[in-house]
Curated annotation (Swiss-Prot):
Matching InterPro entries: Ribosomal_bS21 (IPR001911), Ribosomal_bS21_CS (IPR018278), Ribosomal_bS21_sf (IPR038380)
Protein name, as recorded: Small ribosomal subunit protein bS21
UniProt similarity note: Belongs to the bacterial ribosomal protein bS21 family.
GO CC terms of this entry: ribonucleoprotein complex; ribosome
GO MF, one example: structural constituent of ribosome
Top-level taxon: Bacteria
Keywords: Ribonucleoprotein, Ribosomal protein
Originating organism: Haemophilus influenzae (strain ATCC 51907 / DSM 11121 / KW20 / Rd)
Gene name linked to the record: rpsU
Length: 71
């Protein structure tokens, strides 16, 4: 949990903005969304494999586009 100490003469809005930024950097909201509902291990593996396949397809498409001639 990120801790923010309110500085002297600092407005609430600025302190809240700093807190939100530190929470975003720590990845708290993403973690909460991921843990909101139980996900079976097989579902987790399927999702991770799908993202891996998508990443590889994107990389291959980029390499093929780089190697094709434009004339």
């Amino acid at each position: 949990m990120p801790v923010i100490k309110v500085r002297e003469n600092e407005s609430f809005d600025v302190a809240l903005r700093r807190f939100k930024r530190s929470c975003e950097k720590a990845g708290i909201l993403a973690e909460v969304r991921a843990r909101e509902f139980y996900e079976k291990p097989t579902t987790i593996r399927k999702r991770e494999n799908a993202t891996l396949a998508k990443r590889h397809a994107k990389r291959n498409a980029r390499e093929n586009a780089r190697n094709t001639r434009l004339y």
